[in-house]
């Protein structure tokens, strides 16, 4: 089963992401979506990993997505975890900054469930549902 941490302050966007991930037919082993409504909450949830992927917004109260990515990349236990940014910040500069801080992908909102699913599978190790067991 895949474990994906979704960090997004908008409840409707978290629900959209969850539904897109859970409805993807490529996930025959299932997806465990763990939700955080802020960067601070994500920091509390990271030790409960491991996660196969972290999906994060940039603009959030307290700790923003870029600060979260910096923390993840400095963390010995999470530094190899792929990170996907989902954001309304659409300039080339915003995208370059997120990727230079260690994000593996960057989607500009709004996007379709299919675009999200394709990007998620691109970022997963080997691009398959054969994720490591969690326990």
Predicted regions, residues:
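C-terminal output helix
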Residues: 111-120
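Conserved acidic carboxylate
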Residues: 8
């Amino acid at each position: 089963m895949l474990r994906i941490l979704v960090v997004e302050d908008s409840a409707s966007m978290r629900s959209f992401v969850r539904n897109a991930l859970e409805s993807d037919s490529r996930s025959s082993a299932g997806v465990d979506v763990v939700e955080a409504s802020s960067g601070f909450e994500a920091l509390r949830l990271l030790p409960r990993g491991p996660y196969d992927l972290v999906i994060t917004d940039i603009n959030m109260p307290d700790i923003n997505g870029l600060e979260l990515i910096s923390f993840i990349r400095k963390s010995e236990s999470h530094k190899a975890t792929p990170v996907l940014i989902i954001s309304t910040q659409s300039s080339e500069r915003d995208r370059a900054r997120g990727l230079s801080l260690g994000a593996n992908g960057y989607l500009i909102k709004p996007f379709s469930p299919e675009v999200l699913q394709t990007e998620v599978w691109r970022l997963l190790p080997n691009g398959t549902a054969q994720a490591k067991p969690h326990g």
